[in-house]
A protein has these predicted regions:
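Short acidic-hydrophobic, aromatic-tinged amphipathic segments that line or gate anion-handling sites
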Residues: 14-25, 41-43
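Ligand/cofactor-recognition surfaces for anionic moieties
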Residues: 42-46, 62-322, 326-391
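Single conserved hydrophobic/aromatic residue that forms the stacking wall/gate
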Residues: 1-8, 12-13
Length: 391
């Protein structure tokens, strides 16, 4: 149904939505030849795409996988060679056969990805258990030391570029449901970030500029799909200053009350060795203490509500997620809660990443302690591993 509505909609440009690999290859080759900047949707199985691109010598510079393999046997992953309808029928009539087909498909999937990587593709896993389930299927996905051949994107991208510095998905919802309130909050957030960017350290200046560009373009890209809400990557200082500016605007009657929040996929909110904490290499990535501590700490420091849940995005038993919501109403109490809770909510995770000896986190938590003398975090003692190995 989604496919049919896409093809029939005004949003769809027909040559950008295809369901045949030959047409896809032709369209991609033409786009490369004409140096087009274009997104093309393919309706079908991704394994067929990988194989067609390989056979036709189409270079994939960057590849990933976000298949819902945290639910592999009930529709989270559809095996190659089956239509959507055929696979659904197999799930119902012969689940054992469906499982074996998924396993075979995963092996084939990994095999073709490996071939592309040998040609120069940079491949990373999103964290939705592709690597984990591929290893269970005994696909060629492990190095000799037993680790995965490919990183999660938190290991190579999100962790060292964002989470280690406290940057993550800060959110707010306009309780008034008014577009004009959302517009005002966009302007406030942009002004706050532009001011903070003037004194931002060199290792976070680019993140600040990227997020300023994001918030400036948010409205024109029509990102709202329901509640008048916004998401914006910001660090601890950015979140606090933006929230305080919102609170001031509420007090002055410019906007209605705001609900603050964030994604669980953040600096401190989630423990998952396959995604959020995959760039923690001190052995503690398999523990779930950070998410629990965050929820408890947020509850003490002014959150309106907190939540703790299991399985989000990675799979039941593979991740613990924590979240919060904070209503701010322009009061002095709201300002106190903002400074206390948002500071904790971010810096708790930076402390954890600092203990794991992540360079960015060490720098960031050191700056946080300078800014707030009440914050006391033990810094790691960096020593040469050979000192231990030679004992």
């Amino acid at each position: 149904e989604i496919w049919r509505s896409l093809v029939g909609s005004e949003m769809c440009i027909r040559d950008r939505v295809v369901d045949d690999t030959e047409k896809l290859v032709e369209r991609v080759q033409n786009a490369q030849k004409n140096k087009e900047i274009v997104s093309i949707a393919y309706h079908g199985n991704i394994v067929d795409v990988w194989e067609s691109f390989y056979e036709n010598n189409i270079t994939v510079d960057i590849g990933s996988d976000q298949t819902s393999l945290h639910n592999p046997w009930s529709g989270g992953y559809y095996p190659v060679g089956y239509s959507f309808e055929e696979a659904n029928k197999l799930i119902y009539e012969n689940p054992k056969k469906f499982k074996s087909e998924v396993i075979l498909s995963l092996k084939r999937h990994v095999e073709i990805v490996n071939k592309h990587v040998k040609r120069g593709t940079y491949f990373f896993d999103y964290g939705n258990a592709f690597l984990l389930e591929a290893s269970k299927a005994e696909a060629d996905i492990l190095k000799k030391d037993g680790s995965f051949k490919y990183p999660s994107y938190v290991q190579d991208i999100m962790g060292p570029m964002c989470f280690d510095y406290g940057f993550g998905p800060f959110r707010w919802v306009c309780s008034s449901c008014k577009q004009e309130d959302l517009d005002i909050t966009d302007t406030i957030a942009c002004e706050v970030l532009e001011k903070l960017a003037l004194s931002a350290p060199e290792d976070t200046k680019q993140q600040m500029m990227d997020n300023i560009q994001w918030i400036k373009a948010a409205k024109e890209n029509e990102l709202v799909v329901g509640s008048k809400a916004r998401i914006l990557y910001a660090d601890s200082n950015g979140r606090i200053e933006i929230a305080k500016a919102f609170n001031k605007a509420i007090k002055e009657g410019k906007i209605g009350p705001i609900i603050l929040g964030r994604d669980h996929h953040d600096v401190s909110g989630t423990d998952s060795p396959y995604r959020e904490t995959s760039n923690i290499y001190d052995g503690s990535q398999f523990t779930a203490d950070m998410a629990i501590q965050n929820v408890i700490g947020d509850s003490f420091r002014g959150a309106t509500w907190v939540s703790i849940h299991n399985g989000g995005g990675v799979g039941w038993g593979e991740v613990i997620n924590g979240g919060f919501g904070m209503l701010i109403d322009g009061s002095e109490k709201s300002e106190i809660n903002i400074e206390s809770m948002l500071f904790w909510d971010v810096n708790n995770g930076i402390a954890r990443r600092n203990w794991a000896r992540n360079k960015g986190a060490i720098n960031q938590i050191s700056r946080a302690m300078q800014k707030n003398p009440k914050l006391k975090v033990t810094l790691p003692n960096l020593v040469d591993d050979k000192l231990i190995e030679n004992i």
